[in-house]
Amino acid sequence: ETTPADRSVQIEEGRQIFLKGCSSCHGLNAEGMQIAPALIGVGAASVDFQVGTGRMPMADMSTQAMRKDPIYNAEETAALAAYVASLAPGPAIPSESSLNYERDGSTAEGGELFRNNCAMCHNFAGQGGALTQGKYAPTLMGVEPKHIYEAMVTGPQSMPVFSDKTITPEEKLSI
């Protein structure tokens, strides 16, 4: 379990990574700039998803950024996420234990929820597809369950946020 002292060290490590690798676009205080959005209040889940998948958003939401290979390892990504989470509340990274999606009956339920909420953009097979105005929904093949869950709670790029009232946490796990 992480102690408050460990958490403080991780936040400071994240701040140092942020200042070196992120502040030129997001601002010294994560306030955002013309080229990149503010990060205050986006939460650790958003950072973990964006940095961990290489799907950084643009400040101008009418433009879709191309996916790039992630440049930070898991420890650095966790430190960045901890730093951004320390700035203001936002969606948290789901715990490994909460991502135990191997429940009885969850596969059928997840399939139905996927068809009703996700397939219109990501297509029936999860292969992704074209959207309007030159945007696209990425393939979900090979994406970690954690990142799919984080995308549902943070709404990256053109994707809507699926609040817990729209799709419950248990239903998100089924998807």
Model feature map: region roles:
Residues R7-G41, F49, T53-A59, S86-P94, ...:
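Periplasmic/extracellular electron-transfer cofactor-ligation site
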Residues A92-E109:
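Solvent-exposed, charged amphipathic helical/linker segments at domain boundaries
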Residues G14, Y72, E102, S106:
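Residue-level marker of regulatory loop/turn positions in helix-turn-helix DNA-binding domains and
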